[in-house]
Structure formats: structure tokens, C-alpha cells
Amino acid sequence: MNQSFISDILYADIESKAKELTVNSNNTVQPVALMRLGVFVPKPSKSKGESKEIDATKAFSQLEIAKAEGYDDIKITGPRLDMDTDFKTWIGVIYAFSKYGLSSNTIQLSFQEFAKACGFPSKRLDAKLRLTIHESLGRLRNKGIAFKRGKDAKGGYQTGLLKVGRFDADLDLIELEADSKLWELFQLDYRVLLQHHALRALPKKEAAQAIYTFIESLPQNPLPLSFARIRERLALQSAVGEQNRIIKKAIEQLKTIGYLDCSIEKKGRESFVIVHSRNPKLKLPE
């Protein structure tokens, strides 16, 4: 299997690599699979701990490595990744590779540029932020993806969202290394363009941020979205009643900022979100 670079995927559907990437200070490209699975979730009220194991077999089955090696059991394991820090850091990682990883899967850039790409304000460029990013890169590194063939594991491959994350404050340098086998997740049919407007309009509102990334990754005219499915996506650890309250509040926040036009309908004991329209640029209805 030949090594690939993120440019091979992001540029595969355009005529010239001179065309500006859609990954910039206002947009990020993200794999649909990661946005629909409970990979980046709200921070729990108690200790983070480990996330529940996520079955990604269906979502990752289209990857070349899964097809070529016959992997039929794919799991995502590791630490819980939150929206307020870890997703921001992940956005910075994708920005960095889209800009500097056109011919290499190991890249370097200034810590200041990376922090800005993550969305952290320049006034926070201090020792506390360096520690925050250091710990976040560690969690991304430890978020494992395990491919297995057969119940008795006749073959397997272990990787993660990030292979290496290293930085030197004295040199103002950050180094990142990614697994090229995962770039395929960014193919046109499997990626979503997320605009930062909604994330910026929802500071510290992690449930609303997570639901935004989920709903934005859905196709046009999506089917009614059950609260049970949203609870699964958010991976909250509170009682079901409290989770439903959090979901309703988050939906209202998405409506308030002008992103979502929807209604909530109850069928039996289950509630459903009916999406009427989405506006990533947050234009409030007149």
C-alpha cells in the first residue's frame, strides 16, 4: 500500500493543487465518521476517565486498509476527548497538515501558529496554554484505532488519531506525525466542511458544539433524529432525564445563534428532532 498525503485526498477532486484549500481560519474539513461517532464529546461534570469503546466497523469499513486486509472488527478506544480543548487541538492538527503536509506526514510549524489555528486567543500564549496543548496532544495520541481480522485476531493493526505530537517552547516549534492510512477518511464522500462560526458562537457550550458537528455531518433532508441517537453521540454520563434536558437546551442554543431551524416531536416515549434547515453562516431568520 503506497504512502499517501493529505493533499492526495483533499485535492483529489479539483483540477489544480494551486487552488486554495477550504481548511483555513474560518473552516475545517472533518471526517464524517468522527463527527457522527462519539469521539469528541462534552466534558463530563466529574473526572474524564476513559470513553466507552466505540464500534467503528461500519464507519471505517470503506478504508483501503480494512478492505485489503479483511479487517472486520474496528474499535476506537482511549481517553475521552472534549470539545472545548481536544476538538480545538484536533482542528489545529488538520489545519497544520493541510498547509504543511502536502508531501510529508511529518511536519513542523511554530507553536504560535498552531495555537492560533486551534482557535486559542493570542493572549493565552503562555505556560498554561502550552501545558493544555501538551496534554491534549497526548490524549489525541492515545485515542487508539484497532483493526482486527476475525474473532480470534488472525490479523490486526493498531494506530491512533495522531502518531506523534511534540513541541519545544524555547524553539517555538511543534512537530506532528500522522498515519497516512487514515487520510482516506477525508475523501470527498466521507468529509464535511465545518465552519467555525457556530463553534465560536457557542463558547463553553460543549453539548451544543458536539450536536452542531453531528447535525452538520448529516445528509440533506435528514431523517428525524431520536434523542437516543443524540445521547449515544454525546456519550454523557448523567441520568437519561438529565441528558434529555441537556439536549433540549443545546438545541435551543443552536436555534438562538441562527444555525438550526427545527422542531421537537414526541412519538410514544421517544423525542425526535426534525431538522427543517441548517445555516452554518448563522444568519438569523427575518
From Swiss-Prot:
InterPro entries membership: Initiator_Rep_WH1 (IPR000525)
Top-level taxonomic group: Bacteria
Example of a GO MF term: DNA binding
Keywords: DNA replication, DNA-binding, Plasmid
Pfam family, one: Rep3_N
Gene Ontology process terms (BP): DNA replication initiation
Protein's job: RepA is essential for origin function, autoregulates its own synthesis from the promoter, and, when overproduced, blocks origin function.
The family this protein is said to belong to: Belongs to the initiator RepB protein family.
Protein name in UniProt: Replication protein RepA
Source species: Escherichia coli
